[in-house]
């Protein structure tokens, strides 16, 4: 009638998780929410260690998907990161679903992106890359619209002939296309 042993089982928190979450916030992610099927006590402890803004414990798969839908209806873009079968409905409902490579096959199939389980820093890398890609697209768009508007104005005023305008237009399109092919700078990955 004596206690022989106590066994505690815990999924260890990835050591880079707090740094990845901090980096995502620096990159413009305004709210990081953790949803888990774990108990309140476990969820609170993990949430405190990794630095999420909100956490929900004892959550069922359909609750995760409902939360994603609610956030989308509120006008937010939702990125869902998950690795299990229970994450699949929410991964499917999110604007962007990210699966972890060693997770359930269905999660990987449903997700838009799969990142390596060995390097969660890839999530921040992807966000940084996408931010810089959008900046490049917007810069190229403004440049080409401004340049072509100038060509139209010069053509309407009779300052340049149509053949010169066509040549300059095609040259600018080629230069913008070449600029689009240049590497997009991103900061070093988190390891």
Q: Model segments located where?
A:
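Membrane-embedded alpha-helical bundles of multi-pass transporters
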Residues: 26-29, 50, 86-87, 92-96, ...
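Cytosolic catalytic headpiece
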Residues: 1-86, 92-96, 128-131, 189-191
């Amino acid at each position: 009638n004596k206690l022989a042993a106590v066994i505690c089982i815990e999924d260890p928190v990835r050591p880079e998780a707090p740094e990845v979450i901090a980096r995502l916030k620096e990159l413009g992610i305004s709210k990081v929410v953790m949803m888990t099927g774990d108990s309140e006590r476990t969820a609170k402890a993990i949430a405190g260690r990794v630095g999420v803004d909100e956490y929900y414990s004892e959550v069922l798969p359909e609750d995760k998907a409902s939360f994603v839908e609610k956030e989308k209806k509120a006008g937010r873009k939702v990125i869902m990161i998950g690795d299990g079968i229970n994450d699949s409905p929410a991964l499917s409902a999110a604007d962007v679903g990210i699966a972890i490579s060693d997770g359930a096959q269905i999660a990987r199939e449903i997700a838009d992106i799969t990142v390596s389980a060995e390097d969660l820093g890839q999530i921040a890398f992807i966000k940084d890359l996408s931010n810089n890609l959008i900046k490049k697209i917007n810069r190229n768009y403004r440049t080409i619209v401004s340049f072509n508007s100038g060509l139209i104005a010069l053509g309407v005023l009779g300052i340049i002939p149509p053949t010169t305008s066509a040549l300059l237009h095609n040259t600018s399109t080629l230069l913008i296309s070449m600029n689009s092919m240049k590497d997009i700078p991103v900061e070093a990955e988190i390891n």
